[in-house]
Amino acid sequence: EIPQNLGSDIPHDIIKLPNGQWCKTPGALCSSRSECCKAKHSDSVTYSSGCSRQWSDQQGLFINQCRTCNVESSMC
């Protein structure tokens, strides 16, 4: 299950990237912001998407995961 603080409940566009792969959804492992799917209506300043460092209790280390958040809330 993907934690809600990664933005899994925020609608996002799943698009094919220039490298031919699909963008990664919130909670997926990533290495750069460009790999992550952007929130729908990301042309507004309401949402921000990117690849952020998160602590994984399961693995006992930091991992990079795609995240989408509402910039007007405390999620970002």
Curated annotation (Swiss-Prot):
The keyword Oxidoreductase does not apply. InterPro entries: Cys_Knot_tox. The keyword Transferase does not apply. GO terms for molecular function: ion channel regulator activity; toxin activity. It comes from the Eukaryota. Keywords: Disulfide bond, Ion channel impairing toxin, Knottin, Neurotoxin, Secreted, Toxin. Pfam families: Cys_Knot_tox. Belongs to the neurotoxin 21 family. Neurotoxin with probable ion channel impairing activity. In vivo, is both paralytic and lethal, when injected into lepidopteran larvae. This is U1-cyrtautoxin-As1d. It comes from Apomastus schlingeri.
